[in-house]
UniProtKB/Swiss-Prot annotation:
Pathway: Carbohydrate degradation. Its EC number is 3.2.1.28. Keywords: Calcium, Cytoplasm, Glycosidase, Hydrolase, Metal-binding. Its main location: cytoplasm. This is Cytosolic neutral trehalase.
Length: 727
C-alpha cells in the first residue's frame, strides 16, 4: 500500500515545472511565477509539525530553510535579470564579444541568491560552462520580457550532451524553420544579396501555378506598403533568360497547401514549411535539406522532412530540377541529388498514414524526371564514359557573390578594354566582350557551386570536366532506389503522368524495376572502370577532358559505401587504405593534406580542403560503414565528431557552426578560410546552430552506444575512452 507521505511527494513532483522546458515556456509569466510560488512554499524554518507522524521504513525529511542543500530537485536561484546580466558580462566577458568562453580571463565565479532564502543565501556559479549557460539563460529571459526569474540550477549544470540535444530538438529547428506565403513575404522576399538600385520583395511564379499568382497578387494589392513585385516566370528557362532576370532578382515560389482562413472562413493558401541551413543562408537549399532531414526524423519532426520533399517535387515539376537554392539566379544550377533516399526515409515513418503511398509515388516520379532531364542529359552527361558531371549552364559572373569576389580575376581584363570594373562586368555578361579564358573559368566556378563543395583545390578550374565519385555514387543510389520502390510498392510498373514526362517520354509510359537495375549495373561498371583505383584502394574523380584519373584524395570516396556501389572487397580496401588518411582528432577530413598542397598568401585555404571537416562527409561515411558492418569504425568516427562539437559547445558559449577544423583540439570552430563560419556570430545565446551540424549531432548519437553517450557527457576524449575500454 502506498503511504500518505509517498503520495504527498508524488503529487509535489508531478506539479513541478519542467526545468528543461523550452525558453519561451520556461520564461513565460505563468510558468516562472508558478516556479516562484513552489520555491517559496517549500521554505520552512522548521520541519516540526509538517510531518508529525513517523512512518515506518521512511526516513524523516531533512530540515530545509537553514541551509542550501541541493535536495531532490536541486537549487533554484532568485535572479534580477538586468542587473545580474550586466554584472555577469562586466566581470566575465572580458573580450566584450557578448559570449563567455575559455578565452575570457574573468574570475569564472559569480554568486547567486537562492530562491528558498529569498536571495539571502548565496551560492557560487563556477566555471566557463555554467557561467556561459547563465549568460544564455538570462539573455533568453530578457528577450521574453522577464525582469525577475526563478532559475533552476539544473539548467546551468545540465549534461552538455543532453543540453545540446534538447536545444536542437526544442529550439534550433524552430529557429531555422521557414515558410513562404503572405504572412512572411515582406521578409522572405527581400534578398540581402540584392545588388540592384531598388531592392524590394519580389517573387516569381511558374506558369503551372496560377493559383499562387492570384494569391500573391491579392497580397500585393491588400498590402501596398510591402511593394511586393509579383512576376510570372518565363515558360522556357535558358541561360540568357536567367541572365536578363538578374536585373530583377527574386524569390522563387515553392509548394503551398489549401487551408481555411480562421478569420474569414474562406479558402486560402499557406506555404509548406522547410528548414534553412542558417546564418546568411535563408532559402530552401538542395543537399542541406537532405542532411537536415536525417536529424529532423530522429527528432520526430518528420512533417518538416516530408514538406521539404514536397517542395523539391514542386521545384522539379516547375523548374526542372532541385535548385541550389530558391532564388531566380539559381535557376540553371542544381545540387547533389538525394531525393530518393530522403523520400524513402520519410515514407518509412509515415507509411501508416493516409496518402503516404501517393507521397512516395510523386517523389519517385519527380526523381525520374530529374534523373533524365538534369543528370543524364547534356551538358552534364558524358557519353564516352557513361558517367555524369556537375556542369550547369549559365552566362557571365555569378551575381550572388560579393562584387569584390572576382575583382582580382577581372581587373586585368577591365584594364585591357580600358573599362571600369563595373563596365567590364556588364559588357562581359551581355556578350559585348568575349573572353574564352573567362568562359572556362566561370563554367568551372558554377560547377563547383553546383557540387556543394565550394570551394576546394580538388575542383578549382576543372570541376565541369570531372566525373566525380560523389555524384555518380548518388546517381547509382537513385537507380537502385527507384528500382526497389517500383518493385516493392507499385507491382513493378509505374506510370509516368504528363507533368513528369521528359524528352521523348509520352504520358502513361511505364517504368519497371528491370530498367533501373540495368542502369545501376551499367553505372557500377563505369565507376569501377574510371573511378576505382585498385592500387591505392580508393575511388578518385575522372577528368573527361584529359581522359585521366585525378589524384586528389577526397572523403567523397566513402560515398560509394553509402550508396552501396562498392563491392565488399572494395569496401574493405577503403577501410584499410583510405580511412587512415582521413581520420583526425575530430572525425573525417574533407581531403588529405598532401592532396591540398602548400598554402600561403598566394594560395589560401579552401574550406572544403584539409584541415576542415563537414557534417555531410561524416554522416554519409558513418552510414556507409554501418552498411558494410564496420560498426566499430562508425562508432569511433561518430564519437570523435560528437566530442569535438560538444567541447566547442561547452567551452565557447554554446556555439554550433557550419564547419570545423577537425585537427584543432581546443577551438575547432575557428576556421581560417573563405566565407567565414556561419553560426559563430551571435550575442548572448545561439538560437539556430547550423542545419546539417544540428542533424549530425542527433544522428550521430544514434550511431554510438549508450556507454559512449554517457562518456561523451563527461567530455572524455576518444583516446582516453578507448584506452580505458581496452585495459
Amino acid at each position: 500500500m502506498t503511504s500518505p507521505l509517498r503520495k504527498h511527494r508524488t503529487s509535489s513532483v508531478s506539479s513541478e515545472i519542467d526545468p528543461f522546458a523550452a525558453a519561451h515556456v520556461y520564461y513565460s509569466n505563468d510558468t516562472n511565477q508558478k516556479s516562484f510560488r513552489q520555491a517559496r512554499t517549500r521554505t520552512y524554518s522548521s520541519n516540526q509539525g509538517i510531518f508529525s507522524t513517523p512512518i515506518s521504513g521512511l526516513e524523516k525529511p531533512k530540515r530545509r530553510g537553514s541551509h542550501d542543500d541541493i535536495g531532490d530537485h536541486g537549487r533554484k536561484f532568485l535572479i534580477q535579470v538586468d542587473s545580474t546580466l550586466e554584472a555577469l558580462r562586466k566581470q566575465e566577458d572580458t573580450d566584450d564579444n557578448h559570449q563567455i568562453t575559455i578565452e575570457d580571463v574573468g574570475p569564472k565565479s559569480l554568486p547567486l541568491g537562492t530562491a528558498t532564502s529569498n536571495g539571502f543565501r548565496r551560492y557560487d556559479i563556477r566555471g566557463t560552462y555554467m557561467l556561459s549557460n547563465l549568460l544564455q539563460e538570462l539573455t533568453l529571459a530578457k528577450e521574453n520580457g522577464r525582469e525577475q526569474i526563478i532559475l533552476d540550477e539544473s539548467r546551468l549544470n545540465e549534461n552538455p550532451v543532453n543540453r545540446l540535444s534538447r536545444l536542437i530538438q526544442g529550439s534550433f529547428w524552430d529557429g531555422l524553420t521557414r515558410r513562404i506565403d503572405g504572412s512572411v513575404i515582406e521578409i522572405a522576399g527581400r534578398d540581402p544579396k540584392d545588388w540592384t538600385d531598388d531592392p524590394r520583395p519580389r517573387i516569381y511564379i511558374p506558369r503551372g501555378a496560377p493559383e499562387q499568382h492570384a494569391y500573391y497578387t491579392k497580397v500585393a494589392t491588400d498590402r501596398p506598403e510591402v511593394r511586393l513585385d509579383v512576376c510570372w516566370l518565363p515558360e522556357k528557362i535558358t541561360p540568357e533568360v536567367v541572365r536578363d532576370m538578374n536585373s530583377k532578382p527574386g524569390l522563387l515560389a515553392v509548394a503551398m497547401e489549401e487551408v481555411i482562413d480562421p478569420s474569414t472562413g474562406e479558402k486560402t493558401l499557406k506555404g509548406l514549411p522547410f528548414v534553412v541551413p542558417g546564418g546568411r543562408f535563408n532559402e530552401l537549399y538542395g543537399w542541406d535539406s537532405y542532411m537536415e532531414s536525417l536529424g529532423l526524423i530522429v527528432n520526430d519532426k518528420v512533417h518538416l522532412a516530408k514538406s521539404m520533399v514536397q517542395n523539391f517535387c514542386f521545384c522539379i515539376e516547375h523548374y526542372g530540377k532541385i535548385l541550389n537554392a530558391t532564388r531566380s539566379y539559381y535557376l540553371c544550377r542544381s545540387q547533389p541529388p538525394f531525393l530518393t533516399d530522403m523520400a524513402l526515409r520519410v515514407f518509412d515513418k509515415i507509411k501508416h498514414e493516409p496518402g503516404s503511398l501517393d507521397f512516395l509515388k510523386t517523389a519517385i516520379l519527380a526523381a525520374i524526371k530529374e534523373y533524365h532531364s538534369v543528370w543524364t542529359a547534356e551538358p552534364r552527361y558524358d557519353p564516352v564514359t557513361g558517367l555524369s558531371r556537375y556542369r550547369p549552364e549559365g552566362l557571365g559572373v555569378p551575381p550572388e557573390t560579393e562584387a569584390s569576389h572576382f575583382e582580382h580575376l577581372l581587373a586585368p581584363y577591365a584594364e585591357k578594354y580600358n573599362m571600369t570594373f563595373k563596365e567590364f562586368v556588364d559588357a562581359y555578361n551581355n556578350g559585348r566582350v568575349v573572353e574564352k579564358e573567362l568562359d572556362d573559368y566561370f563554367l568551372h566556378d558554377r560547377a563547383v557551386r553546383e557540387s556543394g563543395h565550394d570551394t576546394s583545390y580538388r575542383l578549382e578550374r576543372v570541376c565541369a570536366d570531372l566525373a566525380t565519385i560523389d555524384l555518380n555514387s548518388l546517381l547509382y543510389k537513385y537507380e537502385k532506389d527507384i528500382a526497389y520502390t517500383i518493385r516493392t510498392f507499385f507491382q513493378d510498373k509505374l506510370e509516368v503522368p504528363a507533368e513528369f514526362c521528359v524528352g521523348d517520354m509520352t504520358p502513361g509510359q511505364l517504368q519497371t524495376s528491370s530498367m533501373w537495375d540495368r542502369r545501376a549495373r551499367g553505372r557500377k561498371l563505369a565507376i569501377d572502370k574510371y573511378l576505382w583505383n585498385k592500387e591505392k584502394g580508393m575511388y578518385f574523380d575522372y577528368n573527361t577532358l584529359k581522359k585521366e584519373q585525378c589524384t586528389y584524395e577526397s572523403a567523397t570516396t566513402f560515398w560509394a559505401m553509402w550508396a552501396g556501389v562498392a563491392s565488399p572487397q572494395q569496401a574493405a580496401s577503403l577501410v584499410t587504405n583510405a580511412l587512415p588518411k582521413f581520420e583526425a582528432a575530430g572525425g573525417l577530413l574533407s581531403g588529405t593534406e598532401e592532396s591540398r598542397g602548400a598554402v600561403g598568401l598566394d594560395r589560401p585555404n579552401r574550406q572544403w580542403d584539409y584541415p576542415y571537416g563537414w557534417a555531410p562527409q561524416q554522416m554519409l561515411a558513418w552510414t556507409g560503414l554501418l552498411r558494410y558492418n564496420y560498426q566499430e569504425d562508425a562508432e569511433r568516427l561518430a564519437y570523435k565528431w560528437l566530442f569535438m562539437i560538444t567541447t566547442a559547445f561547452v567551452d565557447f558559449n554554446g556555439v554550433v557552426v557550419e564547419k570545423y577544423d577537425v585537427t584543432r583540439v581546443v577551438d575547432p570552430h575557428k576556421v581560417d578560410a573563405e566565407y567565414g563560419n556561419q553560426g559563430s556570430d551571435f550575442k548572448g545565446v545561439a538560437k539556430e546552430g547550423f542545419g546539417w551540424v544540428n542533424a549530425s549531432y542527433v544522428y550521430g548519437l544514434q550511431i554510438i552506444n549508450a556507454h559512449m553517450r554517457r562518456t561523451l557527457g563527461t567530455l572524455t576524449p576518444w583516446d582516453q575512452y578507448n584506452k580505458a575500454m581496452n585495459l
